Amino acid sequence: MKTLADAFEHTLQDVYYAENAITKALPKVIEAVSNGDLKTALKDHLTETKGQIKTLEAVFKSIGKKASGEKCDAIEGLIKETQGIIEEGEGAVAKNAALIGACQAVEHYEIARYGTLREWAKALGEDEAHDLLTGILDQEKAANSKLNHIAITEINKPAK
């Protein structure tokens, strides 16, 4: 990478890969959780994530590039960690708590990436990309807030 535009495109490919990987991994998480509100929130976010992939394709188009992913080691690690929780978790309440924590780790990663991409788009004068990325960033923040609320009000107290 030699320019900010290069870094922007590389990171865009990274999150495109990540969102596609998340859509493949999330159904297993949904199946593994037993809390109804958490299950619903994750199902809603899966639908939202599929929409975000389409939005990312529009971002690529807005900068004159073809949508493509580049392997994201960070998301692979977070997914692997989540799979470990699914396989090793025994108590339903503790498993729900650990899985919501893993899901929030993914959300925090996405928030960091989309925040960076949005600001780079602004710096590069890519107004359409900036607006589209702002929309995704807002969705990720809302998803994280919803998970946080469920964790605080329903999951963490019984997990003691």
Model-based region annotation:
Residues 1-160:
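Amphipathic alpha-helical hairpins
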